[in-house]
Structure formats: C-alpha cells, structure tokens
Amino acid sequence: MIIAVDGMGGDFAPYAVVEGIIEAVKEQDINIIITGKKELIEAELKKYEYEREKIRILDTREVITTSESPVMALRRKKDSSLVKALQLVKEGKADAAISAGSTGALMSGATLIVGRIKGIERVALAPMIPGKNGAFMIIDAGANVDCKPHYLLQFSLMGKIYFENVLKIKEPSIGLVNIGTEEEKGNELTKNTYKLLKDMDFNFVGNVEPREATNGDVNILVCDGFVGNTILKTYEGVSLNLIHMIKEEIMKSTTSKLAGVFLKPVFKKIKSRLDYSEYGGSAFLGCKGICVKAHGSSNGKAFKNAIKQAVICYDNKVIDKIKFEIEKIYNREE
C-alpha cells in the first residue's frame, strides 16, 4: 500500500508528520510519499534511522493555509503539498491521502480532485469522538451545512460500513440527532430523515438528544454538518474548560493540592480517554479514494494512528463496500 501524506499540513509540520511516518513504517508494511518542501522534510528525516526505500519525497513549493478560501486555494496553488497528495490518489499512484491542513481545502479537494463515489450525493466528515461508554462517530461533522434527507441516509450507510469494517462492530447503532426523542419532533429535515432510516435494514435507535449524544451509547450520530460541527466544537470546548476549572480549584489551597497529588493517576486516565490522537483522524467518507483528515494540532502519535486508520480502510476495502451498498439501494429503488 502507498500512502500520500501532506508533509506541510498541521500546526507542527513537518516534524510531527515525519515522526508519525517513521513510527508507522516500523509497524506497517507500507510505503509513504511525503509531499512538501524537500529541504525541510529531509532535515527531519535525517534525525531517524529507517528503511530508505519505504519513504520518498515529492517536492512541492506551495502550502495552503487555513485562512485561505478552500476552492480558490485549490485552483491557485496547484503545486501545494495538499493538492499533490490528492492528485496522487486520483492518478492511482497512492491508495490514500492524509493531511492535517485546512479542513475546508481537504474536503473540497477530496470532492473535486479525488471525486465522489457514483451515487453518493455528498462527501461527509466522520470523526471518532471519545465518549463516556466508548468512542462514537458524528457524521456529518461540518462538510455539509445544508442537507437533504437522502444525504443523511447515505451518511448513515457509510458510517455503518466504516464501523463494521474498521472498528469491527457488527450492526452498529445509529441515532438521528434531534431536539427530542419522539418521532414527530424536529424540523422537516429530521422528520423526513427519520422516515427513511426506520425503513432501512439498520440498527436505527431513533432520535438522540445532544445531552445523550456524548455518552457513547449510540455508535453513530447522524446529522447535518452545521449541527455536527456545533456538537463537536461544543464538546471540545466544554472538555477543555472542565479540565482548566479542575486545575484552578486544585491550586487554590494546600489541601486541594495534596488531594491533587493522590488523584494524579485518575486525571491521567481521564486525559488518555479524551485523547484524540488515539483515533488518528477523521475519514472523509464518500470519496473514490481514502482521504483522512488529521487534527490540526496532531502530534507524531496522531499521525501514526491516522496512517493506521487508512491502512485498515484499505485492507478492508471500505471504498468498494460503500460502492456496493449504494448500488444496492439504487437498484432496489429502480
């Protein structure tokens, strides 16, 4: 398997990217093409011992930043590390692309350069989120602000295939994010989506309120990108603020500081459970090729796990299975 990695994407590129790649090639039977500024990437690679034939560099001179218009940047910066990584997938020279760069640019590039699977209306961003009772998926988490019911139906199908093949969970539970659990609750989108999902051969558990969403009791939370992104960012903000408040309270007195010493192992375990790097990245589902968005602040561990995630998708033929299931739906409708 060949994986194209955007060597210039992310807050800590290229050193965190290279660190993750080095660890990944030790553990996986893969080859890596790093796209980016050759001199910077080579300087990082020199710090490590590795099998030279497993990693090569495709020199690029441009970088797409998060402040740029995604579509305009894709058009203007043809020699950017992100565009070149996606082009390698399109041309069949790589089996997957990974980037921690601009989410908007990667989403647009995955759609415009790699392309959508025939029958898929919209590509969806599907991050795995740590929950109280296990990790869960939000789909869509920001790629599509305005949706139609059949988009959400397709999101559910793609999430189901991902869970069954990557996470090895059979018949994952699917919930529709809504303001109430009753079938008649919500707007026109959620009401009509509910009707579609309950008629499918899914483990559909009905509507799920946001306050229950983060428990992890439901494997896949389906919603439009506006709702999904709002849940995701609220969850991140609350988690960070809660940790900050606990630290503040611990430092207020000698007694609480002493208690903090004894509770340190507990806090470490909680931090580990909330660690996004364990899950690698967020898959863009619906593309003709494997595209994974790593977190912007990804460290080496996160990049290594994002690569591992891409390998599992490839080995389990996730793209082919999405194609097959979409064809089945359309054939049934005909």
UniProtKB/Swiss-Prot annotation:
Does the record's keyword annotation contain Lipid biosynthesis? yes
Q: Which reaction does it catalyse?
A: a fatty acyl-[ACP] + phosphate = an acyl phosphate + holo-[ACP]
A UniProt-annotated Pfam family: FA_synthesis
Which SUPFAM superfamilies does the protein's record reference? Isocitrate/Isopropylmalate dehydrogenase-like
Give the record's GO biological process terms: fatty acid biosynthetic process; phospholipid biosynthetic process
State a single Gene Ontology molecular function: phosphate:acyl-[acyl carrier protein] acyltransferase activity
EC number(s) for this protein?
2.3.1.274
Q: Which GO terms describe its cellular component?
A: cytoplasm
Describe which pathway this protein belongs to, using the record's wording.
Lipid metabolism; phospholipid metabolism
Q: Which residues form the signal peptide?
A: none
Gene3D superfamilies from the UniProt entry: Isopropylmalate Dehydrogenase (3.40.718.10)
Keywords recorded for this protein, A-Z: Cytoplasm, Lipid biosynthesis, Lipid metabolism, Phospholipid biosynthesis, Phospholipid metabolism, Transferase
Question: Into which family does the record put it?
Answer: Belongs to the PlsX family.
Q: How does it assemble?
A: Homodimer. Probably interacts with PlsY.
Write out the function statement from the record.
Catalyzes the reversible formation of acyl-phosphate (acyl-PO(4)) from acyl-[acyl-carrier-protein] (acyl-ACP). This enzyme utilizes acyl-ACP as fatty acyl donor, but not acyl-CoA.
Recorded protein name is Phosphate acyltransferase
Q: What is the lineage of its organism?
A: Bacteria, Bacillati, Bacillota, Clostridia, Eubacteriales
